[in-house]
Amino acid sequence: SGAESIAQDKELTKELLHAAGVSVPMGHVVDNPDDAWRVAQSLGKSVVVKPKDGNQGKGVAVNIHLEEQVRMAFSVAQQYGSKVIVERYMPGQDFRLLVVGDALVAAARRDPPQVIGDGVHSIKDLVDQINLDPLRGDGHATALTKIRLDEIALATLVKQNLTIDSIPIQGARVVLRNNANLSTGGSATDVTEDVHPDLAASAVTAAKMVGLDICGVDVVCEDIYRPFEDQGGGVVEVNAAPGLRMH
């Protein structure tokens, strides 16, 4: 449908939302590493570098601010999409808000199994550190499942041109699975009751602007119980809700 194709064009979505007064991470499409660094400097602070038509976090670098990091991230992102976007980094947590019509019906905080590089440790070491968390176990009895370096994780790494022995640069986010399923080391927490009314209204506006009756609005912010104005953050993506597409 038209609405779904709008939702797939991330830049168009962002422009529509910005025009409607919804907070979004501003950014620009860049053609080369020099361009990427120039835009990064103009945005100030930290940036995200990602392929324009990428999905599922492939070729994405978050929270980087040094010139060499930005240039390296550009060359990685370029392998996954024709164009590369540099945008303002929004610190915070990932939330998925489910909007049906005029109402926010559910919200969850989502954390896929991932490690953040420190420029020193290998991916295997970083995973081992995370798995030491007493909340993580091997079954369903614990709050979180240990992150598994299984075939899917290895394949996910290969897609990012990495192995378990790779040492990711400082701040590079390495996703070990492309989803936040609890059973595979991701985590999701129901926060429906906590969403601030202004933030819920922003999500509904976002869905309306894109023209989807049922959609998942992905939000990044520090706290879901405060409006965007108080903390920065904003809507990073609008998706036709998985499993609920209207054909």
Label for each model-derived stretch:
Residues 2-148, 197-201:
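Active-site nucleotide/adenylate-binding loops and adjacent lid/helix of ATP-dependent enzymes
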Residues 126-187:
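Extended, charge-rich helix/loop segments that form flexible
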Residues 103, 111-118, 122, 159, ...:
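ATP-dependent carboxylate activation and anion-phosphoryl transfer catalytic cores
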Residues 26-33, 154-163, 213-219:
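Short, mixed-charge, low-aromatic patches
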